[in-house]
Curated annotation (Swiss-Prot):
This is Urocanate hydratase. It catalyses: 4-imidazolone-5-propanoate = trans-urocanate + H2O. Its main location: cytoplasm. The gene is hutU. The keyword Lyase applies. It holds the Pfam family Urocanase. It comes from the Bacteria. Binds 1 NAD(+) per subunit. It comes from Streptomyces griseus subsp. griseus (strain JCM 4626 / CBS 651.72 / NBRC 13350 / KCC S-0626 / ISP 5235). One of its GO terms (molecular function) is urocanate hydratase activity. Keywords: Cytoplasm, Histidine metabolism, Lyase, NAD. Its cofactor is NAD(+).
Length: 552
């Protein structure tokens, strides 16, 4: 069958390909488009505005067909969501190499990208959409949870109880915000223009209730705040209208951030445009739509700055809304920081980042067993134990059961090897796909997000994600990806990802040990090179070799 159709990854231990590395890539590609997982599966859009798993349905079918027949010493090459070749390599090489959305510098902008996309020559891969390791909203949940925990520690005595957070965006990424806030015992008002997004987050248990109006939302929020009761509230509307209104009315807001699809102006609803007319207007008049969207973002960001001036804790959550507002002429757009320099960079210095794994069996029990193994492996990691317990109780699986937790250098390899042993012993029903977000300690160059305000000024140096991709290829990852524009939009980021399959074999164990040591090791090295003392101490303690620090 050609064209849109429901897609669901196979379950169980029976192979539909010639080996588990190929089978894992096949299942994770299909899982990205599972209706439980993808935001708009009929359009091949997984998350992040227009982040796709395949360029078109013909390309999707060709990738499925190729993966089913790919040999153990062959590698499929994917160019922006289309399979363009199969090469004979060797068993240590990745089974798939992926390059998505990459453009030469002077051409790296949305206008040129859209021209090429209209010609059928490229696609937007976001981060984990085109690299086939998206696991639904859980994929960003712990990072969002840890960010709000850091806000609580910095400003509110270690808890968000008794506070109200105001934010917008309830898509695949932003949908993690309400649960992340309530996991920290706070109250959240979450705005979105799409009623379906609000309903989907309630259905998946990330969002508690929907308010009838801004006044109703504030009433619910204040009641819950005063009772120190966690609550997340969905509010239908345009943040560019509602935030200025709430600011003018002196709404009692303690924290403000945003996760709308501001990275792509065509995915941000301008003031004065009905949501139902959005797609048509964006397609018919993209330049005018972009101008109006940026003007609306400027109003949105101006209100965020206003809340900051009034005493709220305000931060950019990495969607480039400050950059877009500045393009619209708002001079104070960068008065508040991004979340990485404000809260996350010390973790990056330790090689910590979003480690994730998916049960290819489709059995939730496999994830529960790996949860138990994680608690046994790291008995003294209190934050990990708290997270695993909360995730087990509150996280709804989308598609293949999966788990995410932030692990650092010297931890990821231990977890991966333990998982491989569990597959080998038969404790798990089938192999695991072990990967991560491209948002990681050593795999991104993104001056508006992961590498904002680097100590040595190296925000825009893009050698690091390229080195990261090459290191993962050399170390034996099952598939490796190199993308452009994820998270913050065209011209603003280069980033790499890897997935390694734990199939229980000795070879898989050797690969996993190398990949899951070297991949986070790149984060330590990158931050040592930038002059961070924490990273230098980790490198010294853990034996990470950095030639420029040797022989001094």
């Amino acid at each position: 069958m050609s064209g849109p159709r429901p897609v669901r990854a196979p379950r169980g231990s029976a192979l539909t390909a010639l080996g588990w590395q190929q089978e894992a890539a096949l299942r994770m590609l299909q899982n990205n488009l599972d209706p439980e997982v993808a935001e708009h599966p009929d359009k091949l859009v997984v998350y992040g505005g227009t982040g796709k798993a395949a360029r078109d349905w013909r390309s999707f079918d060709a990738m499925v067909r190729t993966l089913q027949t790919l040999k153990q010493d062959e590698t499929m090459l994917v160019q922006s969501g289309r399979p363009v070749g199969v090469m004979q390599t060797h068993e240590w090489a990745p089974r798939v190499l992926i390059a998505n959305s990459n453009l030469v510098g002077d051409w790296a902008n949305w206008e040129e990208f859209r021209r090429l996309e209209a010609l059928g020559l490229t696609m937007y891969g976001q981060m984990t959409a085109g690299s086939w390791i998206y696991i639904g909203t859980q994929g960003i949940l712990q990072g969002t949870y840890e960010t709000f925990a850091a806000v609580a520690a910095k400003k509110f005595g270690g808890t968000l109880a008794g506070t109200i957070t105001l934010t917008a965006g309830l898509g695949g990424m932003g949908g993690a915000q309400p649960l992340a806030v309530t996991m920290n015992d706070g109250v959240a008002i979450c705005i979105d223009v799409d009623p379906r997004a609000i309903e989907r987050r309630i259905e998946h248990r990330y969002l508690d209730v929907k308010a009838d109006s801004p006044e109703h939302a504030l009433q619910l929020a204040v009641e819950a705040r005063d009772a120190r009761r966690p609550l997340s509230i969905g509010l239908l509307g345009n943040a560019a209208e509602l935030l200025p209104r709430m600011l003018a009315e002196s709404a009692p807001i303690d924290i403000v951030t945003d996760q709308t699809s501001a990275h792509d102006p065509l995915a941000y609803l301008p003031l004065g445009v009905d949501f139902d007319d959005m797609a048509g207007l964006a397609a018919e008049k993209p330049a005018d739509f972009t101008r109006r969207a940026r003007e609306s973002m400027a109003r949105h960001v101006e209100a965020m700055v206003g809340f900051m001036d009034a005493g709220a804790e305000v931060f950019d959550y990495g969607n480039s809304i400050r950059g877009e507002a500045r393009l619209a002429g708002y001079d104070r757009a960068f008065d508040f920081p991004g979340f990485v320099p404000a809260y996350i960079r010390p973790l990056f210095c330790e090689g910590k980042g979003p480690f994730r794994w998916a049960a290819l069996s489709g059995e939730a029990s496999d994830i529960h067993k790996t949860d138990k193994a994680m608690l046994e492996l790291f008995p003294e990691n209190e934050s990990l134990h708290r997270w695993i317990r909360m995730a087990g109780e509150r996280v709804h699986f989308q598609g293949l059961p999966a788990r995410i937790c932030w692990l650092g250098y010297g931890e990821r390899d231990k977890a991966g090897e333990r998982f491989n042993d569990m597959v080998a012993s038969g404790e798990l029903a089938a192999p695991l796909a072990i990967g991560r977000d491209h948002l990681d300690c050593g795999s991104v160059a993104s001056p508006y997000r992961e590498t904002e305000a680097m100590l040595d000024g190296s925000d825009a140096i893009a050698d690091w994600p390229l080195l990261n991709a090459m290191v993962n290829v050399a170390s034996g990852a099952s598939w490796v990806s190199l993308h452009h524009g994820g998270g913050v939009g065209m011209g603003r980021s280069i980033h790499a990802g890897q997935v390694s399959v734990a199939d229980g074999t000795k070879l898989a164990g050797e690969k996993i040990r190398r990949v899951l040591t070297n991949d986070p090791g790149m984060g330590v090295i990158r931050h040592v090179d930038a002059g961070y003392d924490i990273a230098e101490n980790v490198a010294a303690d853990q034996g990470v070799r950095v030639p420029m620090t040797e022989g001094n």
